Regions:
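Post-signal peptide N-terminal regions of Sec-secreted extracellular proteins
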Residues: 10-157
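Secretory targeting and sorting signals
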Residues: 1-12
Length: 157
């Protein structure tokens, strides 16, 4: 199930789904508006690619839950993190053809960003995804929700 986060600013920083709050920018960023309209940022859990054998993928998208942004697009960027020792390391390359993308709300093919990394060995490695959604020409928060941590037999180094 995808991780979700409301774009309405919280009153205090909350932990991320993966417990790695150090990867999320602070909630008090200058981009945050007290009356920002809400939308939902979503990121799926890292998983083996069904179209490119030997790689791990993560996808991010956004939903306009209350029709606040009808006809508007957002720039969606996904980050794929792998744990190396005690540190989380970003392993996907940005920019690519599919990341970031500027898309309408909805998710699915053509409405989401995709990040991936190739496996160099089959050693167990922890991964998590992160998504950043920026509505074009609108004020939104700097939230970057994380997926769950997932252990996969794919080491990227």
């Amino acid at each position: 199930m995808p991780a979700t986060a409301s774009a309405s600013p919280p009153t205090s920083p909350s932990p991320t789904a993966s417990g790695n709050s150090d990867l999320r920018p602070e909630q008090g960023s200058a981009k945050v508006a007290s009356k920002a309209a809400s939308f939902t940022s979503q990121v799926d859990d890292p998983h083996y690619s069904s179209s490119h054998a030997g790689s791990v993928n993560v996808h991010g998208w956004w939903l306009d839950d209350h029709d606040n942004f009808t006809g508007m697009k957002a720039r969606v960027t996904v980050y794929l993190w792998a744990k190396k020792g005690s540190q989380w390391v970003q392993v996907n390359k940005i920019p690519t053809k599919k990341n970031p993308v500027t898309v309408y709300a909805g998710g699915g093919g053509g409405k989401r960003a995709s990040g991936s990394v190739s496996c160099r060995s089959h050693k167990p490695t922890w991964y998590h995804g992160q998504v950043d959604v920026d509505i074009i020409d609108a004020i939104d928060t700097s939230n970057r929700p994380n997926s769950h941590d997932v252990e996969l037999n794919c080491q990227p180094w």
